[in-house]
UniProtKB/Swiss-Prot annotation:
PANTHER family: NICOTINATE PHOSPHORIBOSYLTRANSFERASE. One of its GO terms (molecular function) is nicotinate phosphoribosyltransferase activity. The modification Phosphohistidine is found at residue 242. Transiently phosphorylated on a His residue during the reaction cycle. Phosphorylation strongly increases the affinity for substrates and increases the rate of nicotinate D-ribonucleotide production. Dephosphorylation regenerates the low-affinity form of the enzyme, leading to product release. Pathway: Cofactor biosynthesis; NAD(+) biosynthesis; nicotinate D-ribonucleotide from nicotinate: step 1/1. It catalyses: nicotinate + 5-phospho-alpha-D-ribose 1-diphosphate + ATP + H2O = nicotinate beta-D-ribonucleotide + ADP + phosphate + diphosphate. The gene is pncB. SUPFAM superfamilies: Nicotinate/Quinolinate PRTase C-terminal domain-like (SSF51690), Nicotinate/Quinolinate PRTase N-terminal domain-like (SSF54675). InterPro entries: N/Namide_PRibTrfase, NAPRTase_N, Nic_PRibTrfase, Nic_PRibTrfase-Fam, Nicotinate_pribotase-like_C. Coiled coil: none annotated. Its EC number is 6.3.4.21. GO terms for cellular component: cytosol. Catalyzes the synthesis of beta-nicotinate D-ribonucleotide from nicotinate and 5-phospho-D-ribose 1-phosphate at the expense of ATP. This is Nicotinate phosphoribosyltransferase.
Length: 434
């Protein structure tokens, strides 16, 4: 693939629209895996997704031009999966399985387009909402976040001259490469790119992926970004996300169904997938509650992805649970993915080395770390904590608690109800940076 001079590309904006989303494959692989499950098992469920900016001090509607945002969202709605992309999805091997996507699902997917959106402004923030069938609205999450983040980056760099941009990107590349050099010291470490949602830009994420591929070789497991995985002959990686238990819980008609919701979606998942895709995401309503009530068969799954507890503490609790269930943690897998950077990756790896198999999903601090790279401080280049979460399912409020109370989302009254129902054991309040 020819190299792009990112600084020159950023400076030379002579076209009417520079699309941020170039393909519907420019999304995370787990969205496609979940989409097939939703299409098969929940085709008639409605789900609303809402943009949530947890960094309240950043007033997005004052940094990003609303018309530019509309233009990018409208462009994304014109996209369809190409013939080449459909052939790749049908013929490629994912997680050791051929034809992981059924022909019937792919036939439906070939006709897919993103549904309409609702956009308004309130108190300096954008209110961006996607309503409709879950099987359609779910696909807005990743492109919406990528669009918002890249428009913010572009706005921050407007007016910068070509040499300033050269310096900015040269420093960012050097900073990224210094991290690569640290990771090289641990040849058994396994790193994946999980940086699509809050990336600086598509081109920068592509550069980071190519740098990891060359820089750490076999230690680079692949990318969650399907387009970049396809273009760079990498493994497309990802399992499942919080939206599955969030929707299942919202649809629960009584306390018994609410308690069973986190495990019901795992059973649904197991209908379609197996092996290395049997990864548990335990923290939607608190990891302690999940482990306390988990059926014994959950311990037979391949591994866990602790996503909001401090990695060492969260990992230790899962290892202790496996041992309690009579399983050997050395046969299991932990995938760490919450706010990681090279220091926390190395610290966590060294702590658990030899005790459990590990992989690290490196996200925002891989694809959006420009701190100290600009000749003068540019606040708009600092990453923010922004998510696009399910807010309703069939008209009922959806909630996510997590192990960090600051990451909770949902209607405040419903959040309080869930806290009382599931409890707050082992919750650790931490500053949410990304």
């Amino acid at each position: 693939m020819p190299k792009t001079d990112i600084a020159r590309r950023v400076y030379n904006h002579t076209w009417k629209l520079d699309p941020i989303i170039r393909s519907l494959l420019d999304t995370d692989f787990y969205k496609l895996l979940m989409l097939q499950m939703i299409w098969q098992l929940y085709p008639d469920v409605d789900a609303t997704f809402s943009l949530i900016n947890r960094t309240k001090t950043v007033r997005l509607a004052e940094e990003i031009d609303e018309q530019e945002l509309r233009d990018q969202l409208d462009h994304a709605r014109t996209l369809r999966f190409s013939k080449k992309e459909m052939i790749w999805l049908a013929g490629n091997t994912f997680y050791g399985r051929k034809q992981i996507f059924s022909p019937e699902f792919l036939s439906w997917l070939a006709r897919f387009r993103l549904p309409e959106y609702e956009l308004s402004r309130r108190d300096g923030q954008f209110e961006l909402t996607f309503r409709g069938r879950w099987v359609e609205t779910t696909m807005w999450e990743i492109p919406a976040l990528a669009i918002i983040n890249e428009l913010r980056s572009r706005a921050a760099m407007k007016g910068l001259g070509p040499f300033t941009l050269d310096v900015l990107y040269a420093r960012a590349k050097a900073k990224m490469w210094s991290k690569v050099e640290q990771l090289r010291q641990y040849p058994n470490l396994r790193i994946s790119d999980f940086g699509t949602r809050r990336r600086h830009s598509f081109l920068w994420q592509r550069w980071c992926v190519e740098a990891l591929k060359e820089g750490i070789g076999a230690s680079f497991s692949g990318s969650s970004n399907v387009l970049l995985a396809m273009d760079n002959d990498l493994e497309a990686l990802g399992t499942n996300a919080h939206e599955l238990p969030m929707v299942a819980a919202a649809l629960a008609r009584n306390d018994k169904e609410l308690a069973a919701a986190p495990y019901k979606v795992l059973q649904d998942w197991n209908q379609l997938y197996g092996g290395n895709l049997l990864i548990v995401l335990p923290d939607s309503f608190g990891t302690a509650a999940f482990l306390r009530n988990a059926p014994d068969w959950v311990a037979d799954w391949t591994g866990f992805r602790p996503d909001s507890a401090p990695p060492v503490e969260g990992g230790e609790k899962i290892l202790a649970w496996w041992k309690k269930k009579g399983r050997d943690p050395r046969d299991k897998l932990l995938i760490f993915s919450d706010g990681l950077d090279v220091d926390t990756i190395i610290k966590t790896y060294r702590h658990f080395e030899g005790r459990v198999r590990m992989s690290f999903g490196w996200g925002t601090n891989l694809t959006n770390d420009f701190a100290g790279c600009a000749p003068t401080e540019i606040g708009g280049l600092n990453p923010i904590s922004i998510v696009c979460k399910v807010s309703e399912a069939n008209g009922r409020p959806a909630v996510k608690l997590s192990d960090n109370p600051r990451k909770a989302t949902g209607d405040p009254a419903e959040v309080e109800r869930y806290l009382k129902f599931f409890g707050t054991e082992d919750f650790v309040e931490q500053t949410v940076r990304v």
